[in-house]
Amino acid sequence: MNTNTMPLEAETRVLIDRSLENLGWKLSGKEQNVYYEQPRSEAEKKKLGGKRPDYVLYSKDSDKPLIVIEAKKKGVRLDAALEQGIQYAKAIEAPLVFATDGVFCKAFHTVANRPPILNGEEVDEFIREALALRYLTSYEVNTVSPKVQYDRK
């Protein structure tokens, strides 16, 4: 399909798919850990009561949802999309939520009830599975030494 004729939210989904693939997420095949418009299990579908998150991402080593992503067309305010994603994530107990229009991205940690922090800054882009797993124990992750962070400021 020509991207010039796609609905705007579909364009956002193409960008999301590319980003997730580049980060090592599996969109299809035997190792698939990205699910479109539904979670993986019937129990999670039931918890959502017919609602359909745009994406649900899982760790390759777990059946528990790790991330919910809400996709919106360019120019739509992400606050409402993030809130929608938070509701879905809390229903299926996913700790991380992302909302994006393909240009901007907002993230939220449902357990800490605040944005996740990476190296002292709010997360504003999709992350690899290995990094997402580190957010299971804390809303704040450091991948560089505190000295480097301090020197950067």
Write out the residue ranges for each language-model feature.
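ATP-dependent helicase/translocase motor core
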Residues: M1-L66, K72-K153
